[in-house]
Amino acid sequence: MAHQLDEHTLIAGQIAPADVAALAEQGVTMIINNRPDGEDAGQPTSAEIEAAARAAGIEYRHVPIARGMGPTDVEAMRDALHAAGDGRCFIYCRSGNRSALAWAVARSEDGVSRAELARCVGGAGFDLAPVSHLLRD
């Protein structure tokens, strides 16, 4: 189940290659995958999701974030979000939580207020507390 974070961004847990065509029908123009390959047995690989995205005419970025979130993760996430521009972006990880938090930290770097990020992330059912120390004021 996807959660809307802002007018351009959807967050969800793991998807399958077969789900990508439906995302294209919903107007998604960029998929950002925050799962490292091999995180769980049987999960689709980045290459499998990328192939499905390309076949559906969707841009794809693999921004794997394992335990913790460092400056290079934040910068890669920002770059991917900037590449999406004003298009509709679908970001996923195992549950959606890591993606929501990575999105929030990246958007904080772009000047989005802590209050606005809390509203967006909280409205999707996630909590900013684990990354509050990374957010700009």
Task: Spell out what each predicted region is.
Residues 93:
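Short cysteine clusters
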Residues 1-90, 101-137:
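Cys-dependent protein tyrosine phosphatase-like superfamily
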